[in-house]
Amino acid sequence: MALPSTLSSIVLRWVLFAIFLLLVEAGERQYRTESRDGKCVGEDGQVHAVTEIWYNDNDCSEHTCVNDHTGYYEIIRRCTLIVYPPECRLVNGTGTRYPKCCCGVTCELN
């Protein structure tokens, strides 16, 4: 039995929104970094202890220094590109620090 078209439309919008939420959380990259005295030299040029978390509020990112048996790495989490349907619109983030500074999407469900 097929769903009525309005119900199908609502279900599709919610599925798209769920996919959007998954994409928003996917902005993590890991880069090998220089080390100094057992610490990471971050993208900011500063020395950071292993497991230390720091933020760059200018580009809305979170950084973490990690060390495993292969070397030192900086994990960088940033906002990701958002793809959304035409009945939705982009809204500014609610804060100044990652992840609250990332844009979001709001949708009109008729």
Curated annotation (Swiss-Prot):
Pfam families: SVWC
InterPro entries assigned: SVWC_dom
Species for this entry: Scolopendra morsitans
Family: Belongs to the scoloptoxin-16 family.
Signal peptide: 1-26
Tissue expression remark: Expressed by the venom gland.
UniProt-recorded Gene Ontology molecular function terms: toxin activity
Keywords of the record: Disulfide bond, Secreted, Signal, Toxin
Major localization listed first in the record, in broad terms: secreted
Subcellular location field: Secreted
Gene Ontology CC: one annotated term: extracellular region
Name assigned to this protein: U-scoloptoxin(16)-Sm3a
